[in-house]
Amino acid sequence: MKKFTLLISILLLGSTFAQVYENTNVPCKPISEMASHYSALAKASQRADIFDYDVHYYNIELDINIDTEIIYGNVEVHLLPEVDNLESIQLDFASGMTVDAVTVNGANFNHFYDLLSITLDGSYNVGESLVVGIQYHGHPLQGGFQAFAFGHQGNNPSRPPMISTLSEPYGARSWWPCKDVPTDKADSVRISLTTDAAFDAVSNGMLVSETLNSDDTKTTIWEHKYPITTYLVSLAITDYTYWTEMHHFADGDSMPLEYWMYPSSATAPMVERWNRTAGMIDIFSDYFGKYPFAEEKYGMAQFQWGGAMEHQ
């Protein structure tokens, strides 16, 4: 709980400026509407079969077409059965998305009512690992706080496109098939993002590579090696001003602090505000313990909203 408080506090303090300087049209919904939406999703996520298997790793590959607002995905789910004679699994995945194929250890599938039911290619017992691959495409529908959103910087259509996710608490299923419950954290995740070469694609963990493709797109790969729940898997894609610095902890360890800000926001006063993050990390570390993801990075990216969403 202490580490969780630390992470929220740093992000909220670091991103407050956006409420005043960028966003005049922050998305809002009636509390009753959001409560009803989340209640329905929570009930759907309490089905008994979610305990039949344990997810260890997600490999998420997305090709995002900004002009058509269509994403093309390929997700591999690496899992271990928790029961013997496992012959099928269910994943959470929005019905509005189209499943093109299920591969590897998957055979047949049905996709309805936001559930992707997959018949495996055999019967698996406790301790036997398997991989299910899902190829899909579609336009993700927003839900809850946001889930997956195509928009623009500052919510202004005359400014550069802005793509981002805010999947708390059950919104990950709107844009990638997964076991969308906070009780099952994957040990690690790999996220590959292909989109317009002019834009930066930001996600969890450490940058592995950036590759310019022959069709004027760029593929950016991130890897996050801490246990993570699905709603914390995130992305932010737009034209960013980027800078970084190394932060040194009292115990001698160090990690990069990485910042992605809209160019129109990157004035000297705003940059100075974000650069206060290093001091905040020191203060919170003294009170609550060392930053919990010190082996990777602390990253902060501006998006359409005026507040902040803690990821990891």
Language model feature labels by segment:
Residues 19-72, 156-160:
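N-terminal, polar/Ser/Thr-rich
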Residues 126, 136-190, 243-246:
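Glycine/proline-rich low-complexity spacer/linker segments in large multi-domain proteins
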Residues 20-23, 94-155:
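A surface-exposed beta-strand-loop module
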Residues 73, 165-168, 179-312:
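Hydrophobic helix-coil surface modules that form long, contiguous segments used
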Residues 84-107, 194, 198-199:
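Solvent-exposed beta-hairpin/edge-strand motifs
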Residues 4-14:
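Sec-dependent N-terminal signal peptides
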Residues 69-82:
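Short beta-strand elements of extracellular/lumenal beta-sandwich folds
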Residues 60-63, 77, 106-108, 119-124, ...:
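Beta-strand-rich interaction surfaces with strong enrichment in secreted/lumenal proteins
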